[in-house]
């Protein structure tokens, strides 16, 4: 835990290695907001989940931060049969006492990789269970909003995708406070895409593009966003008859099929699965578009050390990283010269290979 990174970069901290002088320093310097991985407000359960005998007693720091008007955001990684159900309800109710200085809490389902030998046997949530989590959270949002002007508790996008439900309207996200936790990313993307499309329709070039534009491109994404990106592609192909967009959800063989986010897709999985498509006769087009978060921050390198150039050579096509945004997606599909302008500096680097021991 490093409270400086929480303040500067938005990292979430558990408070487990912090002492009272550390909290007093935060208060004195008014370092806010402080983002806290709470997981549960049950002290005994928190010790168990974090494998730290001090984790429960560190919850007292929330009271001190609240009393000194330090703005906070909370996170609960929800594990089935551990801190869900009544435990999750208790956690939300307990944390709501820190309103309005705790401005938001996100509930995110635990990501479960295939590398779990010797670890607690976590299970995936079902569609029905995801719906129950959403219902419980949404039933509390109205009360908090009426009293504090904040919806406070938010279910991450994964719950809505798993439950097969529409994403909430933009107003429910309170200005996208928890975007880095996957709360509202899809709603923001959908709204940006729709706004960019309307702007394109009003442009002087639109009618001429409808008649003359011709291109075939492929988009690779994670399973989590596949349906949404596919709908975008269908919409653009209806707008431009000469446009063909193939959208493929890359299966995560490296970490396991239960990992569905694009940011944890390795180069080997991307290349291997798209080569299979090519070998089966699918014409992928002139360019492969990939989300910028597939690459390490500021680099053209995947998690497993394969590079964008490796993918270009293997697939024999241009590979372009796309900034996460509706306008950028449309620009990348319709503009062969598109280049991502900003570095993908919001991605946390995870090394997806083992170094040889010597």
Q: Where do the model's predicted regions map?
A:
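Auxiliary Fe-S-binding modules of radical SAM enzymes
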Residues: 97-98, 111-358
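Short glycine-rich or small-residue beta-strand-to-loop segments that form or flank ligand, phosphate
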Residues: 75-77, 105, 290-294
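Conserved Radical SAM active-site core
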Residues: 1-101, 111-140
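Structural preference for beta-strand elements that scaffold enzyme active sites
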Residues: 33-35, 71-73, 104-106, 152-154, ...
């Amino acid at each position: 835990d490093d409270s400086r990174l929480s303040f500067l970069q938005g990292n979430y901290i558990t408070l487990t290695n912090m002492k009272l002088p550390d909290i007093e320093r935060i208060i004195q310097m008014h370092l806010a907001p402080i983002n806290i991985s709470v997981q549960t407000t049950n002290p005994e359960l928190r010790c168990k989940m974090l494998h730290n005998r001090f984790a429960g007693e560190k919850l007292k720091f929330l009271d001190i931060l609240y009393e000194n008007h330090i703005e906070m955001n909370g996170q609960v990684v929800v594990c089935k049969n551990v801190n869900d159900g009544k435990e999750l309800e208790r956690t939300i109710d307990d944390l709501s006492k820190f309103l309005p200085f705790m401005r938001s809490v996100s509930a995110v389902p635990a990501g479960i990789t295939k590398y779990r030998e010797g670890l607690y046997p976590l299970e995936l949530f079902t569609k029905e269970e995801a719906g129950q989590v959403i219902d419980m959270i949404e039933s509390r949002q109205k009360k908090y909003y009426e009293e504090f002007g904040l919806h406070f508790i938010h279910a991450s996008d994964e719950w809505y995708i798993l439950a097969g439900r529409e994403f909430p309207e933009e107003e429910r996200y309170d200005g996208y406070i928890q975007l880095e936790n996957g709360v509202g990313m899809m709603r923001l993307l959908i709204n940006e895409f729709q706004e960019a499309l309307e702007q394109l329709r009003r442009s002087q070039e639109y009618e001429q593009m409808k008649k003359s534009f011709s291109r075939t491109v492929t988009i690779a994404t994670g399973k989590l966003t596949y349906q949404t990106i596919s709908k975008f592609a269908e919409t653009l192909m209806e707008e431009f008859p000469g446009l063909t967009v193939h959208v493929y959800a890359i299966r995560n063989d490296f970490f396991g099929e239960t990992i569905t986010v694009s940011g944890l897709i390795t180069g080997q999985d991307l290349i291997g699965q798209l080569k299979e498509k090519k070998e089966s006769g699918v014409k992928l087009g002139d360019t492969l578009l990939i989300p910028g978060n597939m690459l390490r921050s500021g680099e053209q390198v995947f998690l497993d050390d394969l590079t964008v150039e490796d993918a270009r050579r293997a697939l024999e096509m241009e590979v372009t990283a796309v900034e996460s945004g509706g306008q950028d997606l449309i620009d990348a599909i319709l503009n062969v010269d598109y280049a991502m302008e900003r570095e993908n500096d919001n991605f946390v680097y995870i090394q997806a290979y083992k170094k040889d021991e010597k």
